[in-house]
């Protein structure tokens, strides 16, 4: 064999070996390195790593952290570029002494304990809510679909309610009809994901409603696959371990009443065509219906609350499509048995919980939660709304939403479930 051929052979073999080494390295980064990070504790219970012996590990940890930080920070960079954002506020360096970079920082955020000015009674209430949630997730007596699956079993499209703020290390699972418009506004301010004439919004109430519910405004978990491919689940787990996760819930029956009022008692073209027309045909025996919601309302054609309950209980409804997010169960939106939430807020105590959460996140000096809407649906209205609903339907409806009642500590509405 001539020398040129030998040279080409060695070149091919060397290139193949190099490619193999690169593949092995990235596979290791995607597994062992990421699981090293996911083993870290939550932000509010972090303990300092020992400072002795860190010198020998610095090369390894800095390599891992550089790769992880690059992935984590690419979220914000992608959003910034897509909105033609030219400046990013500098992140202050942590003032605390010598702790591992891996332990202390995700994109430079200070993960010290969030306990400033906390109210012991409200802290106790939070602990009770979270404990109740964990206990029933582990309790075999409460059974509901999806309870026993793992986080990896959740389809990507079911993670679309988890909004991520990388600047402050926050994940919010939004539940429609539970103050989600204002919490989305808060997340926009914190993440600086939307600009107003070149500058990030500072006041949540300044953000137009049409932008708040635009899916392109928020970074959600279901978008990770397109950005990170095989690393997406690993990265989600890193953030779920490191970030503060919260959600707000509401009495399930009151939430249904609120959804009905806003989507079917007010003129809503989208919900009329997609939901009201089929309901009126199936449950109110209307065969010829106007093309627009305004014409239907003028003719006195409206979905009744009983029609809405029939729709929810009809076994054929979800054979066609999953429940709309406005009446889908919270356990299906936010996966509370797969995600260990750090804060569980309730609409019934919204003002107090919002203030406590902003202190917990250490952002209470930056913004205030917008004032709550005082004309919202009240729990005292339940008996009036369900007065004309047959008892058997009420009992079936409770079974449909029982998991939400139990997991989040809402009492069983006995007055509605018996004659």
Curated annotation (Swiss-Prot):
Q: Name one GO biological process term.
A: carbohydrate biosynthetic process
Reactions it catalyzes = chondroitin beta-D-glucuronate + n 3'-phosphoadenylyl sulfate = chondroitin 4'-sulfate + n adenosine 3',5'-bisphosphate + n H(+)
Q: Which domain of life is it from?
A: Eukaryota
* GO CC aspect terms: Golgi membrane
**Top-level EC class, please?**
transferase
InterPro entries in alphabetical order: Carb_sulfotrans_8-10, Sulfotransferase
The residues listed in the UniProt record as binding 3'-phosphoadenylyl sulfate, with positions renumbered to this chain, are 176-182, 250-258
**Which EC number(s) are documented for this chain?**
2.8.2.5
Q: How does it sit in the membrane?
A: Single-pass type II membrane protein
Sorted alphabetically, which Pfam families does this protein's record hold?
Sulfotransfer_2
UniProt-recorded Gene Ontology molecular function terms: chondroitin 4-sulfotransferase activity
- List all annotated glycosylation positions: 139, 214, 285, 375
Question: Which ranges are annotated Basic and acidic residues under compositional bias?
Answer: 78-87
Q: Where is this region: Disordered?
A: 78-99
Key words of the record: Carbohydrate metabolism, Glycoprotein, Golgi apparatus, Membrane, Signal-anchor, Transferase, Transmembrane, Transmembrane helix
Main localization category? Golgi
Role played: Catalyzes the transfer of sulfate to position 4 of the N-acetylgalactosamine (GalNAc) residue of chondroitin and desulfated dermatan sulfate. Chondroitin sulfate constitutes the predominant proteoglycan present in cartilage and is distributed on the surfaces of many cells and extracellular matrices. Activity toward partially desulfated dermatan sulfate is however lower. Does not form 4, 6-di-O-sulfated GalNAc when chondroitin sulfate C is used as an acceptor.
Q: Give the record's family classification.
A: Belongs to the sulfotransferase 2 family.
Which protein, by its recorded name, is this? Carbohydrate sulfotransferase 12
Q: Which organism is this protein's natural source?
A: Mus musculus (Mouse)
